Structure formats: C-alpha cells, structure tokens
From Swiss-Prot:
It is found in: Cytoplasm. It comes from Chromobacterium violaceum (strain ATCC 12472 / DSM 30191 / JCM 1249 / CCUG 213 / NBRC 12614 / NCIMB 9131 / NCTC 9757 / MK). HAMAP family: Thr_dehydrog. NAD(+) binds at I175, D195, R200, L262, G263, I264, I286, Y287. It catalyses: L-threonine + NAD(+) = (2S)-2-amino-3-oxobutanoate + NADH + H(+). InterPro entries: ADH-like_C (IPR013149), ADH-like_N (IPR013154), ADH_Zn_CS (IPR002328), GroES-like_sf (IPR011032), L-Threonine_3-DHase (IPR004627), NAD(P)-bd_dom_sf (IPR036291), PKS_ER (IPR020843), Zn_alcohol_dh (IPR050129). Keywords: Cytoplasm, Metal-binding, NAD, Oxidoreductase, Zinc. This is L-threonine 3-dehydrogenase. Binds 2 Zn(2+) ions per subunit. It comes from the Bacteria.
Length: 341
C-alpha cells in the first residue's frame, strides 16, 4: 500500500510502498479517507532534536485521520464493515493503575500512532478496536479528520468551568483557535487570544475571539482596560509553549485563577513564582484527550452548534503532500487536510 514515511534520518517525508498491516484478533483495519497534518508531523518533517530521539526510521507517520472499517479481528464487536471511524492515537497498556482506574489518558506506558508505531499517513491503518471511535452521520469527514487536535482543545478548554468567565488563550495555533470557539460556545464572557501571527489571529476572530491581540504591537493590559476588566483573567489556556507568553499569562491572571498548560515550554523556563503563590493560582498540565469522555464531548459540541470549520483552510490530494507541508510551514494556514481517495 501507499504510505508517507520517514525513510531516512533527515528532513522531509517520502511517498513509498509498504506492506499491508497485520490485523490482530482485537484490531480494526481502517481504510484511510482523509488525514490532517499536525504540528507533531512538522517536527518530524523538520527532523528536529525531539524527532531524532523519538521517531524510529523507517516508519510511516501521521495520527490525525478519518476512514472506514475495512476489516476486523475475530474478537471485535460493536463495529461493522464500511462504518466511518476516527480513533484515539494514544495506545494504552490497560494494566497500570491509571488505566485500571479509568484514567487511560494518564497511562505511563502510552505509545503513539505515527510516533512510536506505524501511523495513519497510509492507505490503511490498524489500531486496537478499543481506540476506534464511530463518527455520526451528521459530522463531516473534514471535521472527523481533525478530532485529535480538536480533542486537545476540548480537553484543555473544558478543564475548568468557563461560564461567565474571562479567558486568556496564549498561542493562536489551530488548537488555540479551536479553544476560542469552544470557550465562547460554552458561555465564557471575554475570550482574548494572543500571538504574533496576524493570519492566525484573523482566524481566531472568525472563530469568535472577543479580541485577538498581536503582542508585538498591542499591550495586553491596555486591552484588558478596554474590556473593562479590572481584576484579571479567571482562566488561562496556555497553548504556545512560549516562556514570555506564559509569564504574561501569570501576570494578568486574577487571584484564584486557573491555568491549563498544553504548550510545552523549554525545560529551563523561569517564571515569577510569586504570581502563582500569592495569587493562589491553580495550574494543571494537559496531555492528550480523556478516553473517551473528550470524544463524546467533541460530538456533543458539534451537534449542539459549535462551528470549527473555519480552522480548515487548505485541502490537497495526498500526492501533493509537499504543498500541504509547505502551507503548514509557512504559518499562513489553519489545518491542512490530505485526501487519500
């Protein structure tokens, strides 16, 4: 079958032929319809330090997808051939304390589709049936293909009660932009997002941001005054991994505020701990998606009227994958989708 793979320890990916994956007795074989390019795939494309330490070579990558069930193992129940599915890309052990307690997103033995094992940038993918998620008929292939990052946004944004709250989102990547729409949909008051990328800040405006602030030109505290915010933000969603953005978030949080961290700052990032301690801030790290509560919430949000479609800005046939990666690398895109049909 055709697959998009890292064939050598160097930047880029290559289209190649690989054997069809073997289907275990608890597995689903999924015929891929559409995939989306993730920021992780950009790291792999660039072959940065993290990728060099993490990605086995050769291997085909990718983990954002939608497809149809093309085969199943002898013990699989609850699925049928031709059914549309996406799937949770974190494969968990099922036996550690967190897995047995129903907290699979915290499994210490997690392996990642397209990171530690063969991925979805291929004509077919095999995953445990446990990880597959049926897609309702009223949700498009485009939206289903980005359920993985949409789930990151849902998990982060809904970590705290947002009703009537003032929310600061730092980082206008696709996940941060989707978090804007989620926060507004569930009843946040002001939703302010910061970045230095005007293209993506404009996307955030389309998704409902009260203010989209280019911090290279605008002062965040002046924006807060403009919005008559006298006490600070109630909830912070840090999506950038940028140390200065994180520091500014802590400075502008209200006392008793809550911060969710999805972005990954450098390990030597220094912050003013007085902001955390004397404000009584609550800081929560976010990883992946809750299995599978986040997935059910994604469906419910879309079916109740949440529109995240503006985040999808580019479509390419999979043979045009280099153009798709170029669009992502340019910073002038939202989500980029590759069509495998």
């Amino acid at each position: 079958m055709k697959a998009l793979a890292k064939l050598k320890a160097a930047p880029g990916l290559e289209m190649t032929d690989v054997p069809l994956p073997e289907v275990g007795h608890n597995d689903l074989l999924i015929k891929i319809v559409k995939t989306a390019i993730c920021g992780t795939d950009i790291h792999i494309w660039n072959w940065d330090e993290w990728s060099q330490k993490t990605i086995p070579v050769p291997m085909h990558v990718g983990h954002e997808y939608v497809g149809v069930v093309a085969g199943m193992g002898s013990e699989v129940q609850g699925f049928k051939i031709g059914q549309r599915v996406s799937g949770e890309g974190h494969i968990t052990c099922g036996y550690c304390r967190n897995c047995r307690a129903g907290r699979r997103h915290l499994c210490r033995n997690t392996t990642g589709v397209g990171v530690n094992r063969e991925g979805a940038f291929a004509e077919y993918l095999v995953i445990p049936a446990f990880n597959a998620f049926p897609i309702p008929d009223d949700i498009s292939d485009d939206l289903a293909s980005i359920f993985d990052p949409f789930g990151n946004a849902v998990h982060t944004a809904l970590s705290f009660n947002l009703v009537g709250e003032d929310v600061l989102i730092t980082g206008a990547g696709p996940i941060g932009i989707m978090a804007v729409a989620i926060a507004k949909h569930v009843g946040a008051r002001h939703v302010v997002i910061t970045d230095v990328n005007d293209y993506r800040l404009e996307l955030a405006k389309k998704m409902g941001a009260t203010r989209a602030v280019n911090v290279a030109r605008e002062d965040l505290k002046a924006v807060m005054q403009e919005l008559h915010m006298s006490e600070g933000f109630d909830v912070g969603l840090e999506m950038s991994g940028n140390p200065q953005a994180f520091r500014q978030m802590l400075e502008t949080m209200n006392h008793g505020g809550k911060v969710a961290l999805l972005g990954i700052p450098p390990s030597n990032t220094a912050i003013d701990w007085n902001q955390v301690i004397f404000k009584g801030l609550e800081i929560k790290g976010i990883y992946g998606r809750e299995m599978f509560e986040t997935w059910y919430k994604m469906v419910a949000l879309i079916q109740s009227g949440l529109d995240i479609s503006p985040i999808i800005t580019h479509h390419f046939k999979v043979d045009e994958f280099e153009q798709g990666f170029a669009a992502m690398l340019s910073g002038q895109s939202g989500k980029v989708i590759l069509d495998w049909r």
